């Protein structure tokens, strides 16, 4: 019985230790002079370590601070959609991907990087399949 309690205690301590490593920055804690590449790198590092909430904060910071930079914003939007896919939040991903595709089919499309259109279409189709939604192809 004591061994069982010890094992549970060790598991709880390990879980708390892992949770403390997954800190999520507040937007106010992110340096005001951080550039798009800085924020993207921080987001990617958070993503690679499995801290999707922190990655999302960095991408959302790009959307807020660099709203006039269409290229940076479409990349951040796509990455947020990808975060939703990783967490199997298909509805959220689908909605964002739909908006990205609409941007590429609008008048500002020539200013956007073509790679994200292709990636968004692929993930959009995948999300639609998961949600059992028929798409126009």
Model-inferred region functions:
Residues 1-23:
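Sec-dependent bacterial lipoprotein signal peptides
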